Regions:
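A short, solvent-exposed, low-complexity linear motif enriched for acidic/polar residues
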Residues: 4-236
């Protein structure tokens, strides 16, 4: 008797079907009906990020079943699994569009059962001449306005980030599961005085980026530093 499609697609033993997504979270403005997400005093209209070399770390189900705690377990990588191969590729993720948070799929596929505790990845700089013109030569771009002034915050660095699970026990994968990498705008802009951002070249756009563009080096350094603690992993 021929196998059904469901049988063909069922995960192999010890594996589950998992979808890894990405999104952004922040405060919602309350001053208008069509409110945007806000990062401090910055009203955000769009947020894009490039990723590559992403890998998911987990404590195996075998160790959990043996009574080994998450803290004492050996962290393994899923790079060789179907999901690991998919999410490790270069990605361009749209996290906020027209002021609204988006949920973007990074990848989906089979991955070993266990408790997933963190996701490591590197920001990916879009190449010169890439299709996304606004993201050209950038690895992260946030656009919006501060008190009516058009504002951009961007990075070119291909730096490694670590999204740690919000739960100290990680998230169990044992059956179909959705996990999300979350960029926290409040944490990213904590202690950053965007009211002080300058448009030093008077081109009509306030830019906070590398090489002291527009004279905002201090703000850029703070955001870049905050970013390392502003990304985390959650389940849905």
């Amino acid at each position: 008797m021929a196998c059904s499609n469901d049988d063909d697609e069922a995960p192999k033993e010890g594996y589950s079907q998992v979808t890894l997504k990405a999104t952004a979270e922040g405060e919602s403005e309350t001053s208008s009906e069509n409110s945007r997400l806000a990062a401090g005093v910055m009203s955000v209209s769009s947020f894009s990020v490039g990723t590559q070399d992403m890998e998911m770390k987990y404590v195996s189900q075998a160790e959990i079943d043996a009574g080994i705690s998450i803290g004492d377990g050996l962290l393994e990588t899923n790079l060789s699994a179907e999901l690991g191969t998919e999410v490790s590729q270069e990605k361009s993720l749209q996290l906020i569009v027209d002021g609204e948070s988006q949920v973007t799929v990074i990848g989906e596929g089979q991955t070993p059962n266990g408790h997933y505790t963190e996701v490591l990845f590197t920001l990916h700089q879009h190449a010169e001449g890439s299709a996304g013109s606004e993201m050209e030569n950038k690895s992260l771009l946030i656009e919006g306005d501060v008190e009516g002034k058009s504002t951009q915050v961007w990075l070119a660095a291909e730096k490694q980030l670590r999204a740690v699970a919000a739960s100290s026990q990680g998230y169990e994968v044992k059956g179909d599961t959705d996990l999300s990498v979350v960029f926290d705008l409040e944490a990213m802009f904590e202690g950053v005085d965007m009211d002080a951002a300058l448009d030093a070249n008077s081109d009509g756009v306030v830019e906070v980026g590398p090489d002291n563009i527009d004279g905002n080096a201090a703000l850029y350094s703070q955001i870049e530093s905050n970013l390392e603690g502003a990304v985390w992993l959650k389940n849905q």
